[in-house]
Amino acid sequence: MPMAPKTLQNLKSAFHAETGVYFKYTLWADRARKAGHHAVGTLFDQVARNEWAHAKIWYKRLNQEMDTQEALLAAAGGEHHEWSEMYAQWADEARDEGELAAEKLFRQVAAIEADHEGKFRRMAQQLANGEEFQSAQPVKWVCANCGYLHEGAQPPEICPVCEHPQGYFARQ
């Protein structure tokens, strides 16, 4: 049975609010520590973890669980929107208002978001083709845990340095 529209909107709002607060508290924890207030930083971190847990609750209620392929394609779509519409519009508006520094930043971040879209789409294609850990020609693979570098058509099944499984390797 579909969820009532107001409840659905409230769940979405709760999810976005909790993720925003999580991020804000994490930043404030770092600032507090840099100012010498370690107990305050710890408090912000503890509450931030609670906010993250709350966000996960709302996300699950929204039935947003996706398989990896779906998540990669959804992420690519979100990144596409960010660079091609959102940041492009904001950059134009900043330029029109004479805020050239903000325009430049919006355009620079848009370029990064376009790169993110490409990375998500390439990984989705590799998964779809069964090529996540296979390359037609030798490439460099890096272990995300310890940084071990391996060159070959595929990464080792187990990292020889930290013994993490192949799933920790990505093309460099």
Model-derived segments and spans:
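Non-heme di-metal
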Residues: M1-Q172
